[in-house]
Regions:
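Divalent metal-binding acidic/histidine catalytic loops
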Residues: 1-171
């Protein structure tokens, strides 16, 4: 099973994101993709644009994780087909994207757009046709306390850092 976890630190609250611009309000995106529980792809970077809301920042982060997940799923599916590995064929049907923003989950799972979020449609909706139980990727809410991607976007207290490190690395 492949599972992405994505997060965004809205408005650059992580700290001084850009040493050339210490008052930057760009959000920091972070995500980790795991395959059978092991981290295989991770990233932390500033978003290219200033987002208008924390939901938009989280949606951008989810979109970035999907840009990595979709080709990885296709590659593993091809390995399964060529090598006759049933475990790769069946387990990839169950990819779950974990997100700690209810607003983002709502945008991902509900195919309608409103005038308030229509500007997100063109830029980030490339993955929408891949989302759904029948398509193989499901977006689910996860508590901020369990969000693995927080380690890439926030300065965490030691106890929380160690908890997330254990969730990611097992130590």
């Amino acid at each position: 099973m492949s599972s992405p976890s994505s997060d965004a630190d809205s408005a650059g609250l992580f700290g001084y994101e850009d040493d050339q611009d210490p008052v930057s309000v760009k959000s920091r995106t972070g995500f980790v993709l795991t395959l059978f529980g092991c981290p295989v792809i991770f990233q932390s970077k500033l978003q290219k644009e200033v987002t208008l809301s924390s939901t938009a920042a989280e949606y951008d982060a989810f979109s970035m994780a999907m840009r990595e997940l979709l080709p990885m799923r296709q590659l593993l599916q091809e390995f399964g087909d060529k090598l006759g590995l049933e475990v790769l064929k069946t387990s990839l049907v169950n990819s779950t994207g974990f997100e700690d923003s209810q607003g983002c989950i709502s945008l991902v799972n509900v195919p309608k757009m409103s005038s308030r979020n229509k500007y997100l449609q063109l830029k980030y909706h490339f993955f929408r046709e891949e989302i759904g139980e029948s398509k193989g990727i499901v977006a689910k809410y996860i508590s901020t306390l369990e969000q693995k991607a927080d380690i890439f976007t926030k300065g965490l207290p030691q106890k929380q850092f160690e908890k997330i490190r254990f969730l990611l690395m097992g130590w």
